Design a protein with these regions (language model features):
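Catalytic and substrate-binding clefts that recognize carbohydrates or anionic sugar/phosphate headgroups
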Residues: 1-32
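Carbohydrate-binding surfaces of carbohydrate-active enzymes
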Residues: 28-40, 45-288
């Protein structure tokens, strides 16, 4: 974090100050174009904290878990008991396989504080200023990664007007796209955004671009944010997560072959109403 620390994303006060020194400055400078030539604000990989665990029961290592100043007070208001009296249950399993409600409640409250402080506040500000909040959270793919960094991904999507995902390294993460699409449907949003093609290298050809875009479109992605177009590739920039979808790539003038295809698909996907008759229970809370 450039020699500093990460912001406390569970603190409403901290995020309100973040909005004041960033979003408000954007509004002062280019607010007349909000909702016009500047349709969205993109947030990239917000997270709580990379939660750590002991490697074994008698491990003496120092580990870190998400916390904020008034966490014990808001926890007690929500669940009716003092978490500090149950702290060992966050780190160690109970005997005889007994499930710890305190551990579940800790993860639940951590995620809710995160969603309220960051996404609810940022989303509210964006609505009040006629601009769409979009972007994606950190570590979306599976139950472990979400618990590790977020609590859960789907709860955070409520603050987005356009929920998004990130697909790096030519990965295929079906549940990542599907849970974002599901949240978009449930919250009444118009589509799903994907940041895609990051870390695919200079050799990634149009077949790869089409494949990645096709399977994501099939799972509900309607808006594409390309990673990325460089201003310059001087110095070490030329090794910074290529390729550049711009003049640095010899094929950039032919890229319309790819984008014309997805423009037609997106048009079709955004002109209908989802007809969903199957419900799948997301097991993230059971994982906690």
């Amino acid at each position: 974090y450039n020699g500093q620390t990460y912001v406390d994303t569970m603190s409403k006060e901290a995020i309100a100050e973040f909005i004041r020194i960033t979003h408000e400055r954007y509004f002062e400078t280019v607010g007349d174009e909000f909702g016009k030539s500047i349709p969205t604000i993109f947030t990239d990989e917000p997270q709580i904290f990379m939660m750590e665990t002991l490697k074994f029961a008698e491990d003496k290592s120092e580990i870190r878990v998400p916390w904020t100043t008034d966490f014990p007070e808001t926890f007690k208001e929500t669940y009716g008991f003092d978490l500090t009296e149950k702290l060992p249950e966050i780190f160690w399993d109970k005997q005889n396989g007994e499930i710890s409600f305190a551990r579940y409640a800790y993860h639940d409250h951590t995620c809710e504080r995160f969603a309220e402080a960051f996404f609810d506040q940022c989303g509210k500000w964006c609505k009040e200023h006629n601009i769409v909040l979009t972007g994606h959270v950190m570590e979306e793919p599976n139950l472990f990664s979400q618990t590790h960094a977020l609590g859960e991904a789907m709860r955070t999507y409520r603050g987005f007007e356009l929920p998004g995902i990130d697909m790096l390294c030519n990965s295929v993460e079906l549940s990542t796209a599907k849970q974002a699409q599901s949240a978009s449907h449930q919250y009444g949003r118009e589509g799903v955004l994907s940041e895609l093609y990051g870390v695919t290298n200079w050799t990634f050809d149009f077949r790869g671009h089409k494949f990645q875009g096709d399977w994501q479109a099939a799972l509900g992605v309607t808006e594409r944010v390309h990673h990325l177009s460089w201003y310059s590739m001087k110095g070490s920039a030329k090794r910074d997560y290529p390729a550049s979808i711009s003049y640095q790539s010899p094929w950039y003038k032919n890229y319309s072959y790819v984008e014309d295809h997805f423009a037609r698909i997106s048009t079709a996907l955004t002109r209908g109403v989802p007809d969903v008759n199957v419900a799948v229970i997301h097991p993230i809370e059971s994982y906690w």
